[in-house]
A protein has these predicted regions:
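Transmembrane beta-strands of outer-membrane beta-barrel proteins
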Residues: 22-26, 60-62, 111-113, 154-156
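Gram-negative (and chloroplast) outer-membrane scaffold detector with strong preference
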Residues: 48-124, 132-135, 143-145, 170-179
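Hydrophobic/aromatic beta-strand elements that line small-molecule binding cavities or substrate pockets
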Residues: 140
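Extracellular loop and loop/strand-boundary signature of outer-membrane beta-barrel proteins
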Residues: 30-33, 78-85, 122-127, 158-163
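Short N-terminal segments immediately surrounding and downstream of signal-peptide cleavage
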Residues: 15-32
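Cleavable N-terminal export/targeting peptides
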Residues: 1-17
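Surface-exposed strand-loop-strand hairpins of Gram-negative outer-membrane beta-barrel proteins
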Residues: 27-46, 130-133
Length: 180
């Protein structure tokens, strides 16, 4: 009886994914300082190590880049704020938990991540960098393509209070996940 229990446990453990890695395209709708918005394109990578069939630890990194109208004080000798064309770079590194449930070829998941973000804004001879703590709440779905590969799509809200006036960004990513 004990041997049967051990063999059944080992067999079911082989069916569980020990973890996964993901790499894909990512879009962010970033709210910058002073209420400005920027549509940024970039990449997102993550790795998950499963500790329970439905719970894992996640490491996540992303980079987003793009043009934006950036506020500048006293442009052209004026005393009011004006906007100049510039560039934005946003990099994030986070750690958190992911809950998931596999049913057939579909695996929906939700995750909560904490970490840091670095935002660089530059335009016409000036630049501004901000670093702050961030929290991300995200949901997504993996659709199994083969035994080891799945297509992942996820979206969520990135919140920070450390940048001037705070920042709320939306992020959506899609790409290939490898399960091991």
């Amino acid at each position: 009886m004990i041997l049967f229990s051990l063999l059944a446990g080992a067999a079911s453990a082989q069916n569980l994914s020990a973890g996964n890695v993901f790499a894909g395209y990512s879009f962010a709708r970033a709210t910058l300082a002073f209420g400005q918005n920027a549509n940024l394109n970039g990449w997102n990578i993550s790795a998950e190590k499963k500790y329970l069939p439905f719970l894992g630890i996640v490491v996540d990194a992303s980079g987003h880049y793009g043009p934006a109208n950036i506020s500048a004080v006293a442009c052209n000798g004026a005393s009011s704020t004006c906007y100049v064309s510039g560039n934005v770079q946003e990099s994030t590194f986070q750690l958190g938990v992911r809950g998931s449930y596999s049913t057939g070829r579909i695996r929906p998941f939700a995750e909560f991540l904490l970490g840091a973000a670095l935002v660089n804004q530059s335009a016409q001879g000036f630049s501004n960098s901000s670093t702050g703590l961030i929290a991300t709440l995200e949901t997504g779905i993996d659709i199994q393509l083969t035994r080891h590969f799945a297509w992942r799509t996820d979206a969520g809200l990135i919140q920070t209070g450390s940048f001037p006036n705070g920042q709320n960004s939306l992020r959506a990513s899609s790409g290939l996940a490898y399960f091991f």
